[in-house]
Amino acid sequence: MTGLVLVTGATGKTGRNLVAQLKESGLPYRAASRHGEPPFDWAQPATWDAALEDVASVYLVAPPTVDDPYARMVEFLRSAMRKGVGRLVLLSMASLDAGAPAHGQVHQWLMDNCADWAVLRPGAFMQNFSEGQYLATIRDEDTIYSNTGAGRAAFIDAADIAAAAFAVLMAPEVLNTDFVLTGDESISYDRVAELISQACGRRISHTHISTEALAERFLARGLPEQTAKFLAAAYQRIADGPEGQITDAVRTLTGKPATPFQAFAEANVHVWTPAEARLRGP
């Protein structure tokens, strides 16, 4: 589908990569932002219609800082359909089927109400280690704290998710399906620690903690309580097994293989380097 693409979550892990790909391709897009023109604010529905003006398709990322974000997303989707938006693409999670809590509720709503939709269901993001929940303790404590035990995940690079989103948004045909997006290898957090250790040249360990303790760590980082508990429960699913599945959806949609974790680790050594070591230089 061609036409103006509205990218929500435009400064997030996948959104900024999608914006870059749209810009590089010379395609029209609007990066949804409170500071954009027109402004867009999840907490202010009065801003939505202007942001949706002349939009052909929407890339939909859950807002992290509003109460009951999934009800808010459905409200926004109703507005999008009233404005004549043709295609709606939701970023969900591999572990959440249609009808499941949270993103799964929005997935089900799209199936029941939308004529042209797609849902991207990525596994765990590689970027959780380089700019998310695990960055600070890797950099400052040489430790990854998780509740995943020996569970495995097929970690995926956010750039690969964005490339898949680009392909789905531009697809000439109606898709009306979901895609489980994963990397090409299923590895444990112990193995993640080994790969980051090899890339950084120092030992990074993996320490198992309870789901409750992990949620408390997320709260201490400033995440809202609902988000902290949701994320901790999501990581618990890795210990339970479902995140270990591997699919070829990235290659099918983009024509390219998924990024290996080793390549990701080698490209991100600088973010895990303690400040004093960066100041000293080589």
Regions found by a protein language model. Name each.
Residues S92-M93, P257:
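Catalytic nucleophile serine of serine hydrolases
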Residues R34-G36, L253:
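A short, acidic, flexible beta-alpha connecting loop/helix-capping segment that sits on the rim
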Residues T2-R34, A43-P45, E53-A56, P64-A71, ...:
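Oxidoreductase cofactor-interface core, primarily capturing Rossmann-like NAD(P)-dependent enzymes
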Residues E212-P282:
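A hydrophobic C-terminal alpha-helical subdomain
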Residues F40:
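Cofactor-binding loops of NAD(P)H-dependent oxidoreductases
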Residues V74:
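Conserved N-proximal alpha/beta basic substrate-recognition cap immediately N-terminal to
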